[in-house]
C-alpha cells in the first residue's frame, strides 16, 4: 500500500494511510488474527454479525416506510455535554 507524502506533510500522509487501511479492512483483520479463533467461535461470531446486519436492515426499511421514527438529528452547533457551570 502506498501513500504519497506531499511537501513533507507526514501528518496528512499518515491520515491518508489510515483511511486506506480502514477502507481495506486491515485493522479489523489484524484484530481478528491477533489470537487463534476456534472454528466454533468463528461460526458463532459470524452468525451474530449476520443477525445484527439483518436487524439493522429491517430497522432501516421500517424507518424508510415511516413505520418507525428515525433518530432525531442533533441541532447544528449544539453542545452534547452540559457546560461546567451547569454541572
From Swiss-Prot:
Any one GO MF annotation of this record: structural constituent of ribosome
Does the record carry Ribosomal protein as a key word? Answer: yes
**Coiled coil: which residue ranges?**
none
What residue stretch is flagged as signal peptide?
A: none
Look up keyword Ribonucleoprotein and say if it applies: yes
Region (Disordered) residue spans? 35-87
Q: What is the superkingdom listed in this entry's lineage?
A: Bacteria
Which keywords label this protein? Ribonucleoprotein, Ribosomal protein
- The Basic and acidic residues compositionally biased stretches are 35-52, 78-87
- Gene3D superfamilies xref list: Ribosomal protein S8
Q: Which GO terms describe its cellular component?
A: ribonucleoprotein complex; ribosome
**Example of a GO biological process term:** translation
Q: Which family does it belong to?
A: Belongs to the bacterial ribosomal protein bS21 family.
**What's the protein name?**
Small ribosomal subunit protein bS21
Q: Which gene encodes it?
A: rpsU
Amino acid at each position: 500500500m502506498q501513500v504519497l507524502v506531499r511537501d513533507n506533510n507526514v501528518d496528512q500522509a499518515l491520515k491518508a494511510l489510515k483511511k486506506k487501511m480502514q477502507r481495506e479492512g486491515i485493522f479489523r483483520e489484524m484484530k481478528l488474527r491477533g489470537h487463534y479463533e476456534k472454528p466454533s467461535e468463528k461460526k458463532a461470531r459470524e452468525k451474530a454479525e449476520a443477525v445484527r446486519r439483518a436487524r439493522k436492515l429491517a430497522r432501516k426499511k421500517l424507518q424508510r416506510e415511516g413505520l418507525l421514527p428515525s433518530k432525531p438529528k442533533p441541532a447544528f452547533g449544539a453542545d452534547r455535554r452540559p457546560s461546567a457551570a451547569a454541572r
